[in-house]
Structure formats: structure tokens, C-alpha cells
């Protein structure tokens, strides 16, 4: 079997494996009492990751350059990055729900590359002079890895919104992994200051549990008091969520934050590397090409997300909505500009 035939077989095999893996994750989510299904889903994602990596390796050997020169190759590299980040996120969160959201995206990318792109765009061709540079690997690969991480982080934020049903659940400590959650009006206080969350979720009632510190002589004694507050629509809706859902929401919020925190510096490095390469190739660090403009917009969206979480202390629904919007922005930056826009980065397909 020559390398071209191997690539054709691997791209179809990758699609088939991802499709079956998606079904396994969905069945596992619908029937959580089947642990074998969940294990098969993880194995399927690992097989797809290896299959795509082998395809890219064969492409590299055949063409003699890093396989990121056209849309077909970048789509497969993106899907490989998503499956890789998925495996990291799933291992960190210990939740198979991650695959319910990430697998359809990875499968859709592979399907688009395999079944939709014209055959002449799937063939490796000699590099144009502008791409004959070591910056091809240094810039494009880092950008694609950042897209992968940001997409997975955004998908986990969308999963958080689905799990919480869009309710305003405020999570404490998820940014630094302390654990614990609270709804509006529920928190732990010590001497008037926020300290930590209880080991068990609060009793659902019309009030909230509060831990206050009272000074008795030379020692501080924590006293657990039950206070009542007027019932609000937010509390009424959040009380329908089980502790299991809240715990899962906390995990998704935490992992989403960490994955986006990984993708953002990669995006920053990729943009800087691209500016240096642009200066070498075109004589200008920044020319407001549509791709450059949307890369800057993407950077600003996720910079706002991290700023809101780190500096402003946002957690829960608001940053999740911001991250979910970032998912759309990343796709516009990566695919929309390339296919529909005009500029130095356009692939010239469709229009």
C-alpha cells in the first residue's frame, strides 16, 4: 500500500471511528449505568487520535514538509488537536460527558475535510515560495493547537450551561481548583469574610446556610447558623438541580477555565510568530488582513474571559456565556475568513 492509498484509507477510517465514538458517548450519557460503553468511547477517541496522527505522518513523509499547507491538512490537524485536548480534559475531569460535546465537532471537521472538499484540495502540492519557511511549522501549528484548546474549552463552557440549564450558579474556587459550589445567597462566612465551602452541599430550603465566626475570649468559634431569605426566581430554579449536577457543573467550569488558560498563551505565541513571519515574507508585521483582524478579535474575547475570571472574580454562567461566544469567534477566525474572505490567508474556495 503506497502512502496516498494509506491516507485515503485513514481519513475514511478516522471518520468512521469518530462517528461510532460519538454514538458511544451519547449512549453512555443516556444510559449512565453502562460503564463499558464509556470506556469504549474513550478508547474510540484514542484510536481516532492515533489514526489522524498516522495520516498526518504519512502526509509529511509523502510531501516532504509539515502537513499544514492547505485547508485539508489543517482540518485534520485541527481534529487531531481536538481529540488530544479532549483526552487531556476527560482524564482531568473524570467525566465522560466531555465526549458528548467534543466528539461531534471532531467528527464534523473530519467529515468536512473528507466528504466536502474538492478532490484537488485534498492532494498535496509543492509549497508556494511564501510557505517555504520554518515559520510554517512554528506559526501555523501553534495557532492550530490554540484553536483546538480554545474550542474544547468553549465546548465545556457550553456543556456547563446545558448542565445548569442556564441558571446563575456561582462557583467558588473553581478557578484554582478548591472545589465547592454555591447558589445565590449561599456562602460561608468567617468574621465577615468569604473563606471556603462546606464538605457537603447545603440543605435545600427557603434560606441558606451561613458559617460565621464569633469571638469567644481568645479563640474563634465557628457557629453554623440557618438564616432565611426571601425566595427569588433564581433560587427556585437552581434548587431543582441535584448535587450531582452541581458537582459536575463545577468540574466542567474548572476544566473549561484551565483548557482556555492553556489555549490563550498558545494563541498569543502564534500571533507573535505570525507577525514576525509576515515581516519576513511581506515586509510588514501587521497589515490588517481579515485573518489578522479576526485573530486579534479572538485574542480579545478570550483575554476578556480570563480577565473577568482572574481579576473580576467571575464564575459560573457569565464567563461560560463569554466562552461560548468565543467558540463562534474561533470558527469565524479559522474557517469563515479563509473560505469567504479575501486576503493573504484566503483559500479561495466557494467565492
From Swiss-Prot:
One of its GO terms (cellular component) is plasma membrane-derived thylakoid membrane. The keyword Transmembrane applies. The chain crosses the membrane at residues 17-37, 38-58, 68-88, 97-117, 143-163, 259-279, 286-306, 320-340. The keyword Ribonucleoprotein does not apply. GO terms for molecular function: heme binding. It holds the Pfam family Cytochrom_C_asm. Belongs to the CcmF/CycK/Ccl1/NrfE/CcsA family. May interact with ccs1. Required during biogenesis of c-type cytochromes (cytochrome c6 and cytochrome f) at the step of heme attachment. This is Cytochrome c biogenesis protein CcsA. It comes from Nostoc sp. (strain PCC 7120 / SAG 25.82 / UTEX 2576). The gene is ccsA.
Amino acid at each position: 500500500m503506497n502512502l496516498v492509498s494509506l491516507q485515503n484509507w485513514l481519513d475514511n477510517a478516522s471518520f468512521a471511528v469518530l462517528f461510532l465514538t460519538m454514538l458511544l458517548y451519547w449512549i453512555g450519557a443516556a444510559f449512565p449505568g453502562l460503564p463499558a460503553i464509556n470506556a469504549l468511547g474513550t478508547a474510540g477517541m484514542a484510536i481516532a487520535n492515533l489514526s489522524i496522527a498516522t495520516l498526518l505522518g504519512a502526509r509529511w513523509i509523502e510531501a516532504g514538509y509539515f502537513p499544514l499547507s492547505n485547508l485539508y491538512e489543517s482540518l485534520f490537524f485541527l481534529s487531531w488537536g481536538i481529540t488530544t485536548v479532549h483526552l487531556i480534559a476527560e482524564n482531568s475531569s473524570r467525566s465522560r460527558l466531555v465526549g458528548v460535546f467534543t466528539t461531534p465537532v471532531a467528527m464534523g471537521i473530519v467529515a468536512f475535510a473528507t466528504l466536502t472538499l474538492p478532490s484537488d484540495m485534498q492532494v498535496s502540492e509543492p509549497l508556494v515560495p511564501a510557505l517555504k519557511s520554518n515559520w510554517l511549522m512554528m506559526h501555523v501549528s501553534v495557532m492550530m493547537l490554540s484553536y483546538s484548546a480554545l474550542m474544547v474549552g468553549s465546548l465545556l463552557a457550553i456543556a456547563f450551561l446545558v448542565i445548569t440549564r442556564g441558571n446563575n450558579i456561582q462557583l467558588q474556587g473553581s478557578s484554582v481548583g478548591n472545589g465547592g459550589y454555591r447558589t445565590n445567597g449561599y456562602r460561608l462566612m468567617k468574621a465577615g469574610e468569604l473563606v471556603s465551602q462546606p464538605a457537603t452541599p447545603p440543605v435545600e430550603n427557603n434560606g441558606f446556610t451561613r458559617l460565621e465566626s464569633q469571638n469567644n475570649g481568645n479563640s474563634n468559634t465557628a457557629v453554623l447558623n440557618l438564616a432565611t431569605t426571601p425566595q427569588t426566581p433564581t433560587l427556585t430554579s437552581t434548587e431543582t438541580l441535584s448535587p450531582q449536577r452541581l458537582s459536575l457543573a463545577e468540574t466542567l467550569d474548572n476544566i473549561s477555565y484551565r483548557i482556555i488558560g492553556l489555549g490563550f498563551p498558545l494563541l498569543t505565541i502564534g500571533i507573535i510568530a505570525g507577525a514576525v513571519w509576515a515581516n519576513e515574507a511581506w515586509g510588514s508585521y501587521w497589515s490588517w488582513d481579515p485573518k489578522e483582524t479576526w485573530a486579534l478579535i479572538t485574542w480579545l474575547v478570550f483575554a476578556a474571559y480570563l480577565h473577568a475570571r482572574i481579576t473580576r472574580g467571575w464564575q459560573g454562567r457569565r464567563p461560560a456565556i463569554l466562552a461560548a461566544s468565543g467558540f463562534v469567534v474561533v470558527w469565524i477566525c479559522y474557517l469563515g475568513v479563509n473560505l469567504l474572505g479575501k486576503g493573504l490567508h484566503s483559500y479561495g474556495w466557494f467565492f
